Amino acid sequence: MRLIGEMIARGRQAIVLIPEIALTYQTLLRFYQRFGDRVSVMNSTLSPGEKYDQCERAKAGEIDVIIGPRSALFTPFPSLGLIVMDEEQENSYKSESTPKYHARETALEVAKLYGASVVLGSATPSLEAYYRAGRGEYRLLQLTKRLTGGELPTVYTVDLRQELQEGNRSIFSRKLQELMTDRLNKGQQTILFLN
C-alpha cells in the first residue's frame, strides 16, 4: 500500500493483480479505505459496458488503482507506475484459453512499456520467480518478522534423494518424522498439507 501511495503522489497509477475474483471484495475494501473512490475493479463479472466505462475512466486519469485478475493488466492507464502481483505463484495467473499467456511475464512486459515497477508478492514464491531472484534478475525482499510480532517458523530443507540413498524409503524424511514424534509426545497435534 505504501508503494502504491508513493506512485499516486507522483501522479502515476497502479494495477493490483489478485489470483481469484472471490478475493476482489475484501481487497477492494482495504484499498478503498485508503485511497477512496479512485480505486476500481476490472474482472469478468462486469458487463461489456461496465468494462468500457472503467477503461475510459482509466484513460482519463480518474482511477489511480485498478484491482482484478490477470485481465486487469490490459487496463489502459496513461501513466502506469506499478504492478503488484499478489500470490504470484498461483496457477490462475496462467491463461489456458487463446491467447495463452502468463500474467507474470505479461506484467513484466507491460511494465517495460510504461517504465513501471513490478512487485511479485508471495509467501511461497514460484520456482521460476525464486530462481530469477537467486540469479539477480529480481530483487528478493524477505519478511524477517510478522506484522503481528509473532515469530516466523523454522524451515527445514531436506533432500529426499539423500534420504533414499541412506535407506529411508518412507515418504516422510527423518527430520519430519522426528518433529512429528516430538509434537505427539508433547500431546500436540500435527497437520500435514499435501500439495
Please provide the spans of the model-predicted regions.
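Motif I (Walker A/P-loop) of helicase-class P-loop NTPases
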Residues: 1-5, 107
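Conserved Walker A/P-loop ATP-binding site and its immediately adjacent core
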Residues: 7-33, 50
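Glycine-centered short loops/turns at secondary-structure junctions
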Residues: 11-12, 61, 115, 187
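Conserved RecA-like ASCE P-loop NTPase motor core of nucleic-acid helicases/translocases
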Residues: 12-20, 42, 189-195
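Conserved motor-coupling elements within RecA-like helicase/translocase cores
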Residues: 29-66, 77-80
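Flexible beta-alpha connector loops of hexameric P-loop NTPases
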Residues: 39-48, 90-101, 162-170
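SF2 helicase catalytic motif II
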Residues: 57-119
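Conserved interdomain linker/interface between the two RecA-like ATPase lobes of SF2 helicase motors
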Residues: 105-195
